[in-house]
């Protein structure tokens, strides 16, 4: 168990700097990467491409966004009430 946690910590990477979001408040960065991931996933699925190219966006939004936000957004997408354009 301890070795598994050490491996996770060793391989953990935070979101890199994004010049579109230079300020401390990273809410917009979180939102944009969430949208970008799902747009990428939708586009790659439509083209029959490999979805793994979208994993970078997923890693970034999972690093930046609170889990409760992501859960709420996923539920809203499933219900068709999500406010973003994907």
Swiss-Prot record:
Gene3D superfamilies: Cytochrome c oxidase, subunit VIb. Pathway: Energy metabolism; oxidative phosphorylation. InterPro entries: COX6B-like (IPR048280), CX6/COA6-like_sf (IPR036549), Cyt_c_oxidase_su6B (IPR003213). A motif (Cx9C motif) lies at residues 30-40. GO terms for biological process: oxidative phosphorylation. A motif (Cx10C motif) lies at residues 54-65. Disulfide bonds join 30-65, 40-54. The keyword Metal-binding does not apply. One of its GO terms (cellular component) is respiratory chain complex IV. Component of the cytochrome c oxidase (complex IV, CIV), a multisubunit enzyme composed of 14 subunits. The complex is composed of a catalytic core of 3 subunits MT-CO1, MT-CO2 and MT-CO3, encoded in the mitochondrial DNA, and 11 supernumerary subunits COX4I, COX5A, COX5B, COX6A, COX6B, COX6C, COX7A, COX7B, COX7C, COX8 and NDUFA4, which are encoded in the nuclear genome. Belongs to the cytochrome c oxidase subunit 6B family. This is Cytochrome c oxidase subunit 6B1. The lineage of its organism: Eukaryota, Metazoa, Chordata, Craniata, Vertebrata.
